[in-house]
């Protein structure tokens, strides 16, 4: 299998899924394919980021983060540096999940906080990439009481009548979320958490070795 085999994000993710299910010995036998997949994955990410940045006149660099705090993380945006960092474990969650993470972080370049403008920008990017349907976005305000009797004001966004961003507070750090109506999150990981963790550790070791042997020259934090 060569790098050309990984001509789409879907093929990269399918390989990563199968890699997780291999025995430790079989994982080592897939070292060359893992490196090829990683290079192709970076190329696909480059293409998506460049396309969005060109369309919206943005500047953005990106790099992998193979550091310690990547469990459960997907990406981070450093808007003051015009940079995003992506955690390689995203490859185990599906191609549309990767696209969603990237577009989410790109929306943070001009909107650091999870507020109205951010979510509308995020939705617009998803629509431009045809990952969400076109349509009217409407906002609904909801006031609820917490267990201490305080009134909290939440906002939600609907796309074509379907809930798409669920409950964020405009004046706090409470993070809203894209709901299950977003088809990007309909992709469930096809392997267990434990298998995914083992696969991630093996992938990290392979990529570290490839970097040391100068098989990889892409920039990443490790």
Give each language-model segment a name.
Residues 105:
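Walker B catalytic acidic pair
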């Amino acid at each position: 299998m060569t790098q050309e085999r990984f001509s789409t994000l879907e093929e990269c993710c399918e390989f990563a899924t199968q890699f997780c299910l291999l025995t430790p010995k079989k994982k080592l036998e897939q070292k060359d394919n893992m490196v090829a997949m990683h290079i192709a994955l970076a190329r696909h990410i480059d293409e998506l980021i460049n396309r969005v940045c060109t369309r919206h006149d943005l500047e953005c660099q990106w790099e992998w983060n193979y550091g310690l705090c990547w469990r459960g993380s997907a990406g981070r945006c450093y808007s003051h540096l015009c940079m995003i960092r992506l955690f390689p474990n995203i490859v185990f969650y599906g191609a549309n999940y990767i696209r969603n993470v990237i577009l989410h972080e790109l929306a943070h370049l001009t909107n650091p906080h999870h507020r109205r403008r951010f979510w509308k920008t995020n939705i617009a990017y998803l629509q431009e990439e045809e990952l969400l349907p076109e349509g009217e976005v409407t906002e609904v305000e909801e006031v609820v009481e917490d267990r201490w009797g305080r009134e909290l004001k939440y906002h939600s966004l609907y796309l074509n009548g379907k809930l798409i961003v669920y409950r964020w507070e405009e004046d706090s750090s409470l993070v809203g979320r894209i709901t299950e109506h977003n088809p990007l999150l309909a992709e469930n990981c096809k392997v267990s958490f434990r298998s995914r963790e083992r696969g991630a550790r093996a992938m990290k070791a392979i990529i570290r070795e490839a970097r040391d042997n100068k098989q990889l020259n892409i920039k990443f934090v490790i």
